Amino acid sequence: MAETETNPLVVFATVATIIISFVTLYFFKQSAKSSTTSSSSSSSSKSKKGSPALIPDKFQKFPLISKTQVSHNSAIYRFGLPNPTDTLNLPIGQHISIGTIIDGKEVVRSYTPISLGDQQGHFDLLIKTYENGNISRHVAEKQVGDFVEIRGPKGFFTYTPNMKKSLGLIAGGTGIAPMYQIITAIMNNPEDKTKVHLLYANVTENDILLRDELEQYAKEHPDRLKIHHVLNEAPEGWQHLTGFVTPELIDKHLPKPSADTNLLLCGPPPMISAMKKAAVSLGFDKAKPVSKLGDQVFVF
């Protein structure tokens, strides 16, 4: 019987096939391992950063976790987010809405948090309680552990670092809230060179909100922040401004109108109406009925 002769080409092809199979299996395992590691890393990173807690068109419930009285009729309310790493993801200068049902009707009121949008785990609202204020009384009656319904973000103003060389801010009462948020963002960012000038109007000295925090920022950043308090009813020995915010005060203490300046207003309607007229008399653009980003004069 003749001996079968092995074909070298067949042997080579067989060996090559085996080698290719091993190489393919090796790289498949490495790829799977890399993918798993990447997925785990991505998941860990996402968990670490947390998630935005707000939904623009849907009210969600957030628990009240603390209440700090800052004047006879105003308090800072701290609300918890679902997870310790969650954030509001609220652009600087925008606001949220609190809603509830009163006498069968939905009532909604907007507030700007004084905490920044990237604050993790909670957010703070500065709210003044008015006798006829449905939402302010609704919140004031809440106890720690109770929930409020909130949605957002909303608003037409978004602050970005160095968007203008200077900002003139005029605030009355709790109208300081969006101004404080903007000031905090600027002063906490060493890359932001914006100069800020604030005229803050109140009735009495006890009505001044966030005074210590504002003056601490001014002390730490004297070249970037100037604060001018104005009181209708000034006590004896008051070292700041008295009366009402007038065109003369605006002209003296705030930046002049220019392409590199924004004038931001927030306060009671009568005050805002007077400030818009004063701004026009000083050469600023006329404020529009609804302010939009890019307007020289913006009303919150």
Curated annotation (Swiss-Prot):
Alphabetized InterPro entries for the sequence: CBR-like, Cbr1-like_FAD-bd_dom, FAD-bd_FR_type, Flavoprot_Pyr_Nucl_cyt_Rdtase, FNR_nucleotide-bd, OxRdtase_FAD/NAD-bd, Riboflavin_synthase-like_b-brl
SUPFAM superfamilies recorded: Ferredoxin reductase-like, C-terminal NADP-linked domain, Riboflavin synthase domain-like
Database matches in CDD domains: cyt_b5_reduct_like (cd06183)
Pathway(s) it belongs to: Protein modification; peptidyl-diphthamide biosynthesis
Gene Ontology terms describing biological process: protein histidyl modification to diphthamide; tRNA wobble base 5-methoxycarbonylmethyl-2-thiouridinylation
Binding site for FAD: 140-155, 166-198
Gene3D superfamilies in alphabetical order: Nucleotide-binding domain of ferredoxin-NADP reductase (FNR) module (3.40.50.80), Translation factors (2.40.30.10)
Annotated keywords: FAD, Flavoprotein, Membrane, Mitochondrion, Mitochondrion outer membrane, NAD, Oxidoreductase, Transferase, Transmembrane, Transmembrane helix
Transmembrane segments: 8-28
Main function: NADH-dependent reductase for DPH3 and cytochrome b5. Required for the first step of diphthamide biosynthesis, a post-translational modification of histidine which occurs in elongation factor 2. DPH1 and DPH2 transfer a 3-amino-3-carboxypropyl (ACP) group from S-adenosyl-L-methionine (SAM) to a histidine residue, the reaction is assisted by a reduction system comprising DPH3 and a NADH-dependent reductase, predominantly CBR1. By reducing DPH3, also involved in the formation of the tRNA wobble base modification mcm5s 2U (5-methoxycarbonylmethyl-2-thiouridine), mediated by the elongator complex.
The protein, known as: NADH-cytochrome b5 reductase 1
Gene name of the encoded protein: CBR1
